[in-house]
Each structure stands twice: as structure tokens, then as C-alpha cells.
């Protein structure tokens, strides 16, 4: 045959002849591989039985039933032994990216855990973003911004109750004789004090009220008003029956006054008080739990400002020959003779004249004119003082000494 002859010619020429692959040998190798796979499956099953985690073999897939691969038929395993499943193998070793620890409770728990973790993560991110966008403001920042004056306007009074440069002018005369707002602004503030209209932010009077609230544009203007007021209030008659309040909350006091003689007239007490402080209300009698008068008077006052600060009332004083005592919260204890706070009058070595009120000599050796201890003017004593109740026309007509 030509084919056989061609092959012989090739052998004669010394060329190697390519032989077809040996199929029976390949089938034998597959059979050997099948036996190796069967042996590994048996080992896995034995390990699973020892651990108690052996699972029933699942039914074969359709691809396996249809005989899509020849390897399954070539296994030739014993009856009842199925191909190993992935769940039958032990957990993968450390470092295997596909390995994971199986939950004994089943895979049904994992979705809930993952969902809860995702929600917690989103909630933390949202809180962090909100904290970054809305930084908590400094306490009181809104109030400070509201009190800050506008840039295009002159500095005015700030919010109510804070930073207001305010005084209150009160009329203490008869209600029917209360002056108008024009008198307070024109005669008192502008003419007597000498303020400029641009220094004043507002002058407020409630209809029917005897109080005038004066708001200044700065603390300097307020200080100027108070300084001039202390000078003019005793010199000019226009300030009679007027008092200025609201200079300092610490200057408001509840005063108690006591005399050994209960016949001292309350109007004389008010006259003496007006020399040293501003009387906000008429003194009233203090009674005990039985309703009996204790001899004390109580009233609300406002201390005045001096060069060194608040000017306090003396703890002891005289109205005529009657000695009176005063006290209030915060009143310093001073010597009656020299006014020192380091000692009392019992140990004081300073001489003081009770006739003229000056230091350095005693009353029997006084060569100066007498000074009234009620009104503070020189030239007459308390008995002849025109401001004393017993010298008033009303007292002479009625014969009442002021009770």
C-alpha cells in the first residue's frame, strides 16, 4: 500500500515518525486520579464524622445528572458515597482570603448584623458632619451681638438692663405740682447741668408718672451728669424736690433710725437725711409682734457718690440736743469725733467742737459761729432753724409738734 510504503520510506531515510497519543493510557491515568479523589473524599468524611459535623449529601445537580463531564463516571466510588461538598471541608487556613468562620446559628444572623452595623456607621457619620457644620456658639454670644450698636449710628444705650447709661429723675413734691417733661429736659438737664442734646439718647416719661428716665449715649456723659449734679443740687432751687436715682444698685439701702426721745418729729429726720442721702420713701415706724412701736424708723434711701466713692451716713448724730443712731447693711463703723475707721470715740484723742462741728478745739473754747445740726447752715441753732417743724407756720397754728 502506498501509505505503508511511505512509512517504510520514512524509516529508511532515518526521519522519526510522529505517533498518535495513546488513549488507553490516558484513561488509565484518569482512573488512577479518580481513585485518588475517592480516597480524599473518604478522608474528609471520616474527619467530619469524628467532629459530628457531617452533613447529608445533597442531591446532584442537573449538570451532573446529564453527564456533562466524564470525570464523575470515572470516579467509580462505592454506592452511597457522594462527591464532597464545600461545607464538608474544614475551615480554610490562616491567610486564605476565601476562608471565613461559620456561625453555628446559621447564616440567617449575618444579614441583621450587617444591617445594624451599617446603620450605626451612617449614624456616626451624620453626627460628625452635623458637629462639623454647626459648632456650638459661645454662651451669651447672641446677647452680645444684639447689644452691639450699629456701625453707622453713634453708640447708644444697649439692650434693656445691660450696659444702659441710665439715671432716673424723681419728683417728690405734691402730685399736682409735678413739672412737665419739657421743664425736666430744658431747665434741669440742658440749662442747669449744661448737657448737649447730642449727649442724650432718650428721656422717657410714662404718662401720669413723676419719674423721668434719662438715657445717655456713653458712660462718660453719665459720669459728667452725676458730677455736675452733685455740685448744682444744693446751689440751685430748680432741683428742689428732685432726686436722681439709679446711679448704683449698691447705693440703695434700707435705713433704720432710732432716738431715745420718741417726740423727735419725723419731718425733722427727713430734713437731716436729705443733707446726706436721697430719701426714696417717707420713714415709717417699726413695731414689734405686739404692734407696739419700738421707737425706730425705717425708710429706703440711696447713698450719694463722693470723690472717694460712696458717702456713708454717720452712725450717730444730733438733732438739737437729741442724739440719734443710724444703721444699714454695709455701713462702716467710724469714730464719732474724727470719722476714723480704726478706732471708736472712746479711745479717740482728737478734740471736736459740737458747736461749729470742726476739729481741733472743744465747744467751750469755740470762737466761731454756731452751725445748725439740722440744716447745716451757720448762724443759728436747731431751736431757731426755719426748717424745723416746731418753727413752721402750720405747727404754730395747730400746736402740734409733728406727730
Curated annotation (Swiss-Prot):
GO cellular component terms, semicolon-separated: cytoplasm
Phosphotyrosine: residues carrying this PTM: 201
SMART domains: ZnF_C2HC
Comp. bias (Basic and acidic residues): 26-38, 47-65, 95-121
Keyword field: Antiviral defense, Cytoplasm, DNA-binding, Immunity, Innate immunity, Metal-binding, Phosphoprotein, Repeat, RNA-binding, Zinc, Zinc-finger
Assembly: Interacts with CGAS. Interacts with RIGI. Interacts with IFIH1/MDA5.
Location of region: Disordered: 1-158
GO terms, biological process: activation of innate immune response; cellular response to exogenous dsRNA; defense response to virus; detection of virus; innate immune response; positive regulation of RIG-I signaling pathway; positive regulation of type I interferon production
UniProt cross-references to InterPro entries, sorted A to Z: ZCCHC3, Znf_CCHC, Znf_CCHC_sf
Cell location: Cytoplasm
Zinc fingers typed CCHC-type, residue spans: 335-350, 352-368, 372-387
Annotated organism of origin: Homo sapiens
Function: Nucleic acid-binding protein involved in innate immune response to DNA and RNA viruses. Binds DNA and RNA in the cytoplasm and acts by promoting recognition of viral nucleic acids by virus sensors, such as RIGI, IFIH1/MDA5 and CGAS. Acts as a co-sensor for recognition of double-stranded DNA (dsDNA) by cGAS in the cytoplasm, thereby playing a role in innate immune response to cytosolic dsDNA and DNA virus. Binds dsDNA and probably acts by promoting sensing of dsDNA by CGAS, leading to enhance CGAS oligomerization and activation.
GO molecular function: double-stranded DNA binding; RNA binding; zinc ion binding
Name of the protein: Zinc finger CCHC domain-containing protein 3
SUPFAM superfamilies membership: Retrovirus zinc finger-like domains
Lineage: Eukaryota, Metazoa, Chordata, Craniata, Vertebrata
Pfam families, per the entry: RBD_ZCCHC3_1st, RBD_ZCCHC3_2nd, zf-CCHC
Biased composition annotated in UniProt, kind: Gly residues: 67-79
Compositional bias ranges of the Low complexity kind: 128-139
Amino acid at each position: 500500500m502506498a501509505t505503508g510504503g511511505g512509512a517504510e520510506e520514512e524509516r529508511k531515510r532515518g526521519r522519526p515518525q510522529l505517533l498518535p497519543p495513546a488513549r488507553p493510557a490516558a484513561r488509565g491515568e484518569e482512573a488512577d486520579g479518580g481513585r485518588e479523589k475517592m480516597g480524599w473524599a473518604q478522608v474528609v468524611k471520616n474527619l467530619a464524622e469524628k467532629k459530628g459535623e457531617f452533613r447529608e449529601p445533597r442531591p446532584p445537580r442537573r449538570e451532573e445528572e446529564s453527564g456533562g463531564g466524564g470525570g464523575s463516571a470515572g470516579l467509580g466510588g462505592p454506592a452511597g458515597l457522594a462527591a464532597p461538598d464545600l461545607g464538608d471541608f474544614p475551615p480554610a487556613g490562616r491567610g486564605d482570603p476565601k476562608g471565613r468562620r461559620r456561625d453555628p446559628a446559621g447564616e440567617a444572623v449575618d444579614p441583621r448584623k450587617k444591617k445594624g452595623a451599617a446603620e450605626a456607621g451612617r449614624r456616626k457619620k451624620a453626627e460628625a458632619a452635623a458637629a462639623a457644620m454647626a459648632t456650638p456658639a459661645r454662651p451669651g454670644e447672641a446677647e452680645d451681638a444684639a447689644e452691639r450698636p450699629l456701625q453707622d449710628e453713634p453708640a447708644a444705650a444697649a439692650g434693656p438692663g445691660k450696659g444702659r447709661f441710665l439715671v432716673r429723675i424723681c419728683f417728690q413734691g405734691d402730685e399736682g405740682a409735678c413739672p412737665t417733661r419739657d421743664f425736666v429736659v430744658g431747665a434741669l438737664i440742658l440749662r442747669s447741668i449744661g448737657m448737649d442734646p447730642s449727649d442724650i439718647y432718650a428721656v422717657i416719661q410714662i404718662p401720669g408718672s413723676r419719674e423721668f428716665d434719662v438715657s445717655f449715649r456713653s458712660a462718660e456723659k453719665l459720669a459728667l451728669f452725676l458730677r455736675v449734679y452733685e455740685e448744682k443740687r444744693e446751689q440751685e432751687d430748680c432741683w428742689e424736690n428732685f432726686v436722681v436715682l439709679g446711679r448704683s444698685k449698691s447705693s440703695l439701702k434700707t435705713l433704720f433710725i432710732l432716738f431715745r426721745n420718741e417726740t423727735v418729729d419725723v419731718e425733722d429726720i427727713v430734713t437731716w437725711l436729705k443733707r446726706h442721702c436721697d430719701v426714696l420713701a417717707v420713714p415709717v415706724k417699726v413695731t414689734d409682734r405686739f404692734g407696739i412701736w419700738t421707737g425706730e424708723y425705717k425708710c429706703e434711701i440711696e447713698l450719694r457718690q463722693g470723690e472717694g466713692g460712696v458717702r456713708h451716713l454717720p452712725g450717730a448724730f444730733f438733732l438739737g440736743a437729741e442724739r440719734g443712731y443710724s444703721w444699714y447693711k454695709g455701713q462702716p463703723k467710724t469714730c464719732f469725733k474724727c470719722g476714723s475707721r480704726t478706732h471708736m470715740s472712746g479711745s479717740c484723742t482728737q478734740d471736736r467742737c459740737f458747736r461749729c462741728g470742726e476739729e481741733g478745739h472743744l465747744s467751750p473754747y469755740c470762737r466761731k459761729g454756731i452751725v445748725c445740726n439740722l440744716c447745716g447752715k451757720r448762724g443759728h441753732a436747731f431751736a431757731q432753724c426755719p426748717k424745723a417743724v416746731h418753727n413752721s407756720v402750720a405747727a404754730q397754728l395747730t400746736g402740734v409738734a409733728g406727730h
